[in-house]
Structure formats: C-alpha cells, structure tokens
C-alpha cells in the first residue's frame, strides 16, 4: 500500500513538473508550474501594493518580483559559491518578465485574476504549484547543491538543511527585510527572524525531511524508511505544499477577523 501510494505520488509530482505548453512556431516550451508560479507571485505583489502600485517604477517592480520568485535559490547559490540559477535560464526571464508586464501594463489582467482567485480552491491550486516548485529548489538548489559541493560534501547535514530551508523561503526573507512589497523600500530586521512564518517552518521541515529520508544514518535516528531521491522529493512536495496551503487558510481567517470589527462599526 505504501509503495503504491508513493509511486502514484511520484507520478503526480513529476508528471506535473514535466507538463508544459508547447509553442512549435516559436520553439518554446513553457512549463505549467512555472507559469502558475509567475502568476501567483505577480498577483500577490500587486495585491500587497494596493493603491501604491502606480508609484513604483518598472525596474523596481521587476526586481521585487524576481527576488520574490528566486531569492531563496539565489541566496543558497551565493552561500555555496555557485552561479545563480536565474542567470542560466532565459526561460525564467521570459515567463516572469512577461507575466509582470501583463500584470502592471493594464488593469484588466489583475481584475481577471481577482475573479479567478475568488473561485473556491483556485488559490490553493496555485499554491500547490508553488509548493512543488519550491520543493525542487529546496532539493536541487539546497540539499543536493551542498552534497555536490566539493568543499562541503554529502555528510554536511546542517549545511543541507540550512541551504535547503533558505532555498524554500529566502525570497520571503529578503522581501520582509527590505519591505519589497511596498512602494518605498527600507531595510530593517526581518520580522521573520523574530517570529518564524509558516513558509519558513514548512521550508525547514521539508529540507529536514528530505535530508533525513535520503540519509541512512539519519533514517535510523528518526525511525524513517530510506527513500530514493524521487520518492523523497515527492513526499517533500506534499510537506511543503501542505504547509503553504495551510497558510492560505490562516491568512484568510485573519482577514475575516479584521473585517468583522469594521463591519460592526458600520452597523453602529
């Protein structure tokens, strides 16, 4: 039963990761998960700006969304002395740049997304895509990047967990530190360092789980079955996506709590 479930999970996670829109005329292949992630990042950024979206410059907004999208993996790469992944991918700039342009060049695309995200479970669908992509960053840009680093190696468990966790939530850390989701940027101590966010906790648990599940010695300590790389990544995607989806509900509950006093004041 466990083997069957794991195999099905591997097929789903990696099947979604491989799904893409083919554009033969242009010779393009656009991965669905990357497109959904780009839309989610830009929509979240545009929503956070509220009315101040008209005050930001094009370069400022693009840089903010790039940090939000790839800040985690880039932070891990810098720590390990590796080239930034976004510099090795023309596709990244095409997908995220085009999505950013659509979001801020006219009001209609954002209004359409507002309608789309109002549909039940739609936000969770985009968030699940975000979770699968982040898991790939945790695994490839964090844990495996440490294992393949000649100066570190496969036995550096702490480095794996740190770089893996940063790959999953580093973008949010930089966004919070420099207030990138506002029109005026300023540096201050990241609030996430005082109170860990759901993203940080989920990313940390994902890095810890993957490292433990693929390391025989750690499996013995945590009493876990040893998993292959694909199996461990698939279950890690469940852990991270589950945490991020939970965050969407928490955020919604908090918003409703804030709206209730305002409605009561209006009634009075």
Provide a role label for each language-model segment.
Residues 45-48, 138-145, 248:
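Transmembrane helix-loop junctions and nearby membrane-interface residues
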Residues 109-189:
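Membrane-proximal helix-loop-helix units in multi-pass membrane proteins
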Residues 1, 82-87, 143-158, 218-224:
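Helix-coil boundary and interhelical linker segments in multi-pass alpha-helical membrane proteins
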């Amino acid at each position: 039963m466990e083997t069957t479930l794991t195999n099905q999970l591997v097929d789903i996670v990696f099947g979604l990761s491989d799904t893409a829109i083919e554009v033969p005329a242009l010779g393009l292949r656009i991965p669905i998960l990357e497109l959904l992630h780009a839309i989610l990042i830009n929509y979240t950024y545009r929503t956070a700006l509220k009315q101040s979206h008209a005050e930001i410059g094009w370069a400022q907004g693009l840089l903010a969304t790039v940090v939000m999208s790839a800040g985690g993996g880039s932070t891990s790469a810098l720590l390990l002395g590796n080239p930034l992944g976004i510099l090795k991918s023309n596709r990244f700039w095409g997908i995220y740049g085009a999505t950013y342009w659509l979001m801020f060049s006219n009001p209609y695309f954002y209004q359409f997304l507002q309608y789309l995200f109002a549909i039940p479970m739609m936000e969770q669908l985009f968030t699940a895509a975000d979770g699968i992509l982040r898991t790939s960053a945790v695994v490839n840009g964090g844990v495996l990047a440490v294992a393949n680093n000649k100066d570190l190696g496969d036995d550096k468990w702490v480095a794996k967990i740190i770089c893996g966790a940063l790959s999953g939530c580093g973008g949010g850390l930089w966004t919070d530190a420099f207030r990138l989701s506002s029109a005026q940027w300023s540096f201050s101590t990241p609030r996430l360092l005082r109170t860990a966010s759901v993203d940080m906790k989920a990313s940390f648990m994902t890095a810890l789980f993957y490292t433990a599940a693929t390391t025989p010695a750690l499996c013995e300590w945590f009493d876990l079955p040893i998993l292959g790389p694909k199996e461990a990544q698939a279950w890690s995607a469940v852990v991270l996506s589950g945490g991020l989806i939970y965050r969407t509900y928490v955020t919604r509950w908090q918003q409703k709590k804030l709206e209730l006093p305002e409605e009561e004041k209006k009634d009075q």
